[in-house]
């Protein structure tokens, strides 16, 4: 073979060999792709549980097509065929994170958001070194943020918001040097904000808000994050001052630190944040003045500083913030006049300065704010005239200036504000007539002009304002007749013309106002008969025409008003008999027919009004006959006035109306004895005088015992009965004491045996341990702490121990009493639902900031243990009674009550199925280090599903003094039972007394004692009585909420969601329109609650004989005042002390 041929052959062989090698490598790679391990991991993960068919349908992943880079949804791959992005959003998977994430070697983006992920964040996440974006937001993840994330040096975005993550923010996160976004809001994180975050100079977004337990000061090092555009720390417990270093954040656009515990002054350095657009610092404890440097923020659009303690005035420089759209400075202590420079803010849409101390006049320059939509100036000291120039604000929808010192007339030009929806100028000194043009505003829903000195007629144009929902013109000097055009107000639900000088008849057209819920025409000079069309208003809840000159008969058709809860016809000239049809008004709570010319007998049908609980006033009429026996059915009634009539007969029907607190039967012709009960023995002579045949001088005693079904007995019978009762009481008491002593002895003996047995069986039977959190201790460490010196409490379900474990943690351990069973072990395993299984089942499914954190449980055959966070301040009960409440000022008590209400509302309304606690009491509300409340002891907790609610229980549910009354006769437990128990706790917190307290006269229940004292400030704990008037007002409102909770009828109690809402609003109460945004409610529905609108003088509501001094009445009115809630309007109607809504 020639050399040339040899060389050619050698060259060809090499090429052929290289080709074969390339084909082999390609085939190997293809085979590797077909056996893609990443695809197998994802497929196995997706099918590791049973996703819903609807969720699974969104995935086209299958085991046959093992090439995710070509076909699979939610997956993106690199050109080499490796997965780089997993992007799954809003798909309910209910899975934990894949276990083998480090196997995804090229993964750069992992987004699984809104997917109901469960479990914890695995440490292995830190091995996905290529990750740039990690978004696991809006899931159900628990546990700590793993420290291993600090190894992700390429990470730019970390989004873990809206989970249930606990623990601290890892300081080592600062090692992620490329991090731009750190978003952790709405979790359960604790601890302080790491100072190390200041090392992340590239950080653009920090959002940590909504973590209530994050505390400490805002680190000044945050100012070193020079690229920061968003800083969100709202709704946390950060405290201290705002660091001046925030002024170094030249790129900052949003500063959101509201609803925290920060204090001190607003640093003037914020004026250096030239890019700032949104400044949210409301609901804090900031003091000092608004810095003038705020005027340097020329890009600022939203300035919210409401509910702080700011003083001084609004700086004139604010007019330089030419882009401002919203200003809210309400609920501060600001003073001075409104600067005229406000008129330079041409983009301003909302200007709210309510509830301050501003004075001076409304500047006319404000009319230059041509974009203005809301103008709220209420509750200040502003004087002078309302500028007519306001009529040029054609976009204005809401104008509140009530409770000021304005004078002059209402400018007719306001009628040019064609978009106006709500106008409230109440409680000023306005004069003149009501401009007729206001009733030409087609969008006006609320017109309130209460308590001024307006005169003239009600404009005939009233019928043109068809959108009106609330019209309140009370307490003015308006004359003339009510226009018939009122019948065109088809949406009106609240009509108040009270305390004016109106005369003539009420037009029949009022019956066309089909949405009316309240009519108040009291204190006028109206005459004629009550128009029959009123009876067609099926939704009417309150009808008050008292103190007029109405005559004729009371229409029998009023009986058709089944929604009516207050009917007040007193101080008129009504004649004839009381219609028997009123007995059909089953919802009536107050019936006042006093001071008329009514005759005939009291109809027995009034006894059918089962909800009549406030008052029945029939005084000062010409009624005759006897008290019908059916009146005894009014067992809820509080006030009864039958005085100044011609009634006769005995008082037997009144003997068993158990809830009566006020009774006046003076100046009648009653005869016989007085029923021998507590009410009659406490009556004053004035309530009985004028009855010549009652308790005549020939009788030895005025009191006789009334026995149901047997009438009145004589005095000798009463004496013998009392002696017999005393003898029986002594015998029963002695028997009970002996039984208790015997039971204690037996229990102690059994407990000693059980302790010995547990000690022995602890070695024989294996312990099982189920943690619900990440725990660093063993069962052995817990067991050795279960000794008598460590006992910190005993309850109906077990003994609670303090356990100091080796890692320095302190936890609380409840050792449950053994289950009481009948039968063998198999029957016990199958049938018994003791407190252990109830607590584990309940606590394992709930997480809330005001419910004690359940750490885990462990058990063997004889011993069952539950582990919780330890609460260093003990229980609410111990703080109130063992330490005499000295450490609890009003603010702390309020916070505890609100937190407990929110926790209980979570159990009732946010758990599926709802959870009834069954043993709410002061000792089951634990107090944390910062006096935050935690609901504890679910030993009697019961899951309530649709088939179980209201079912009779076989065990006593609750603790003595806290148990709802219906349990005694029905054995039924519902959420409303918890509401009652919570109401008792509120009374306990306010009064400082236990439910059954030795200091309460005659040993009556706390609820009854508070009711008897009718809202007097004297019921408050002595340490609270010296508080400010504003705080006293809050306390009396909370007391009123408590009385709603302890209503004897479960159906009449509010829900815990309503209670929490009422309590929350009491602290920030701004009467009817506190923080209302009518931009979001263009046409409020007719069902809007009315309690905040009703400021009726209580003296006009109840019989004169039942009224006390005006000071006492003001206290009682404060008692039930509350703001907007979903609770029924009727329950709070006529309870506000305010005359303005």
UniProtKB/Swiss-Prot annotation:
InterPro entries: Kinase-like_dom_sf, Leu-rich_rpt, Leu-rich_rpt_typical-subtyp, LRR_dom_sf, LRR_R13L4/SHOC2-like, Plant_RL_S/T_kinase, Prot_kinase_dom, Protein_kinase_ATP_BS
Keywords: ATP-binding, Cell membrane, Disulfide bond, Glycoprotein, Host-virus interaction, Kinase, Leucine-rich repeat, Membrane, Nucleotide-binding, Phosphoprotein, Receptor, Repeat, Serine/threonine-protein kinase, Signal, Transferase, Transmembrane, Transmembrane helix, Ubl conjugation
Signal peptide: 1-33
Residues engaged in binding ATP: 792-800, 814
Compartment list: Cell membrane
Stored Pfam families: LRR_1 (PF00560), LRR_14 (PF23598), LRR_8 (PF13855), Pkinase (PF00069)
Protein name: LRR receptor-like serine/threonine-protein kinase RGI1
Organism: Arabidopsis thaliana
